[in-house]
Swiss-Prot record:
Carboxylation allows a single lysine to coordinate two nickel ions. It is found in: Cytoplasm. Ni(2+) 1 binds at residues 159, 161, 242, 385. Disulfide bonds: none annotated. It holds the Pfam family Urease_alpha. This is Urease subunit alpha 2. It is an enzyme of class 3 (hydrolase). The active site is at 345 (proton donor). Its main location: cytoplasm. Keywords: Cytoplasm, Hydrolase, Metal-binding, Nickel.
Amino acid sequence: MGVVDPKTSQNTSKKRIDRRIYAEHFGPTTGDKVRLADTNLWLEVEYDLTSHIDHQPDIDSVNIGEEVKFGGGKVIRDGMGQSQLLGEQVADTIITNALIVDYSGIYKADIAIKEGRISGIGKAGNPDIQPNVTLPIGAATEIIAGEGKILTAGGIDSHIHFIAPQQCETALMSGVTTMLGGGTGPAEGTLATTCTPGAYHIHSMLKATDAIPMNIGFLGKGNVSLPAPIVEQIEAGAIGLKLHEDWGSTPKAIDNCLSVAEEYDVQVAIHTDTLNESGYLDSTLGAFKDRCIHTFHTEGAGGGHAPDILKAIGETNVLPSSTNPTRPFTINTIDEHLDMLMVCHHLSPAIAEDVAFAESRIRKETIAAEDILQDMGAISMMSSDSQAMGRVGEVIIRTWQTADKMKAQRGHLAPDQSAKTEQSLDNIMLSPTDSDSGNDNFRIKRYLAKYTINPAITHGISDEVGSLELGKWADLVLWSPAFFGVKPDLIIKGGLIAAAPMGDPNASISTPQPVHYRSMFGSFPKTVAQTCITFMSSAAIDKGVDRQLGLEKVIKAVHNIRKVRKQDMKFNSYCPQMEVNPETYEVYADGELLTCEPAEHLPMAQRYFLF
């Protein structure tokens, strides 16, 4: 037995089938377009690794007819698409014919998973009888059918208030597989701020989440003017620090926190001073001293210097994000926010100063501008602000609702020069995204990056998660296109299925009602220990914190953080010169007035949640 000669194989069959029939059997291929849920966003398949020799989208090298598919009378059978290779030579799991949607490209491929990581992306099959097989299938291989499905990396929510452990399940079922933030439960400090303060609480939360099927990292409290209290939190296991105005985000605290972060290579996240008590925006920017920092909800109502926190977006060292309560701007956004804000920040409607504080944060002009800044790639990330005004299960939904609203209001989004340069440097293929192509690939990559690769880069975990690339942790989400972004088909953690919609367990098959999301085998404690990651600082790992606490999850260090700049944000690196009129709240980016109308109707909404 030996590898088949591709030249000989090319002559074995010349039968052709209609493109529609092909898509029904194997999913869309190069040039086909797919609608995302009920939005007006259309992706186009850029190339197809399952049916091209040498992985090139060249019409002269097509090898259609060798696709693999599982099922009765289909390809993946002994002696056909399944080889005789031993387990160590084949993948543990193959996802067949999936449409990968990633910042790195929108393309068709088979995906191999081995020991919890993505071990290959290419062409699966039996190398003894099929040409150009890069991912051998054997008796040790499980198959997940990706035909007609979209595959993405698991989402990353980088703004979590750990108020309730049930958030983790809700987030997982929405397609989020990594949660970064702080908290200790429904204490007032956690209800308002994303801090896990001190070694005792950090250790307690690390132990409490050790059996939860989610990658997790905790932020310590950064609001202190001397280094030692910050150092002890980093060495206790924090992945970084959070500065929050409710604890006092003074220039001294900011400078001190960033100085320690520089020494320990961890990230600092900040919620700036809404009341401008300890200084104005320029005071805060000055305290940054050109050091990289993740500015939480750099937008209209999340909190921060009123009314001009949006100006921070123009700084090259600032890595800005939005939270989802203001995403996108709708006719209900303003009315919803006042009560939410009062509860979240322990304010009283009976105290005039508290009401004034809340009202100062809610400005329709800056919320509207936030939509456009997201679409321009000036705001780099999206997150939830879970149970602290944000909805933990709606990061992905709100991201794509914003993208759809911006297409409706701003039209087609063509690649900008920075994105072309970025893709050239990364050897990423640009699809035809001119106004005549009819696809939204560029906009799709821009918005997908906001909750996948960009928060991973920002927090020093992009070696492990954040994209669908060779060698990364197999945190994957499989979607039916009609339900993309709303209800996943499968959530895969570290190569095992952790959650899925499942019917009555007593039924004769898996589909009878009631169908709802249930935990699968990959979410139970002994498997969580191999499929999920706890992130810590290198200093904590060096001190053996994980061993001292008896943690069972995979432990990984955050790293390569302090040199990150806005230009490193994939598809979201625009640094405009920002101006905010202090009287009218009008927002300008590079001299352009940013304004848009609130949406009256949204996709991915009620029709998906009737039952």
